[in-house]
């Protein structure tokens, strides 16, 4: 299990699975979903405000089981901070703003809000919670510097609570703060204590410091409706204090060439095409030349504008959730999963050597071993791609719970480099987590692999 421990303890590759970004959230026309003309109104002009970098910037997000109150808590945070000028109040309906979310009553696409405490500036992602949307969970959690795990006091930990914690740990989220929500719906204080105990045991099981993790009990709905201050407003204030103190400000990699995994592509009438994502490393400046690589594309363009939370920037730094206006490209030229990089700084690869931990049955992985040429889907940065797994010479079976060195050949070349983390999934199961150790050239035998 040494390699498994290494994989789980290694600081994450900063580029794994970037999440949706807040660039003009809810007003643009995304690549695959039409927006009404009304939503795009007023975007033909430059942003009037300039983003001021006067506090440390930290990316956090809510995770947890469906209907445990993640979006309600996010709304409550903005309401409380808005009273002191640290946020713009976002109603539940505004956060839960995609048509499919409203229609089905569950959060499908991750939404973003911005707020500031006295100590920090936060970009907050409201992550999806339904089992069918774990794919979004994978691509929506990795850039987070920490998570707020929401657990309903009247339910306790549920299946997606476990799965979200497992995925968060696999993709490198090392710090979690817990909010036990809906405490107003539970009359028995002993039940709340049991839920807290169960959560701490679960955190420890997944490699977190369960005994040290802050656990705050409250009710996000009470905070929103300004009822029962102890369970409502004060509990959310305690949560924000815990996030400020327990989740550290990460060290940003500003010295390397910039790398921006593309999360979404939008078209703004009168201005052009915007790509959004989290800048994983380096500094991106207005006027920079860039390449967009992956999915058999190699597109060169120039960044003509940068914005974050409706505010313009002359330069963006690693960790920023941003939108970049690109010159001379149409929306249909681009897609999610491409990576914007400094020209010549990195190339796509189709084959990697990697140290991979295969999840056991108890961890939610496969029940049975697999053989060479097994074809799972690899998730890294914002892309996912089918791949063939090649076992080491003399190895016939890869067993659940095993850690081993594997070769993986992708269906198409994608951005991969040494130290990059990835997740392997088969159907609706996460089956493995890995770390790239080398990027060798393709052999003739590799090129002849069949994909049908």
UniProtKB/Swiss-Prot annotation:
Metal-binding as UniProt keyword: yes
Residue ranges of the region described as G3: 126-129
Segments of this protein annotated with the region G1: 64-71
Name listed for the protein in its UniProt record: Elongation factor Tu, mitochondrial
Modified residues (N6-acetyllysine): 79, 88, 256, 361, 418
Pfam family, one: GTP_EFTU
Function: GTP hydrolase that promotes the GTP-dependent binding of aminoacyl-tRNA to the A-site of ribosomes during protein biosynthesis. Also plays a role in the regulation of autophagy and innate immunity. Recruits ATG5-ATG12 and NLRX1 at mitochondria and serves as a checkpoint of the RIGI-MAVS pathway. In turn, inhibits RLR-mediated type I interferon while promoting autophagy.
Residues bearing PTM N6-succinyllysine: 88, 234, 286
Phosphoserine PTM sites in chain numbering: 312
Binding site for GTP: 67, 69-72, 181, 184, 219-221
Region (G4): 181-184
Transit peptide: 1-43
Top EC category: hydrolase
Quaternary structure (record): Interacts with NLRX1. Interacts with ATG16L1.
Organism lineage: Eukaryota, Metazoa, Chordata, Craniata, Vertebrata
Positions annotated to bind Mg(2+): 71
Reactions it catalyzes: GTP + H2O = GDP + phosphate + H(+)
GO cellular component: mitochondrial inner membrane; mitochondrial nucleoid; mitochondrion; myelin sheath
Segments for region (G5): 219-221
Gene: Tufm
Keywords, ordered alphabetically: Acetylation, Elongation factor, GTP-binding, Hydrolase, Magnesium, Metal-binding, Mitochondrion, Nucleotide-binding, Phosphoprotein, Protein biosynthesis, Transit peptide
Gene3D superfamilies the UniProt entry points to: P-loop containing nucleotide triphosphate hydrolases (3.40.50.300), Translation factors (2.40.30.10)
Region annotated G2, chain positions: 105-109
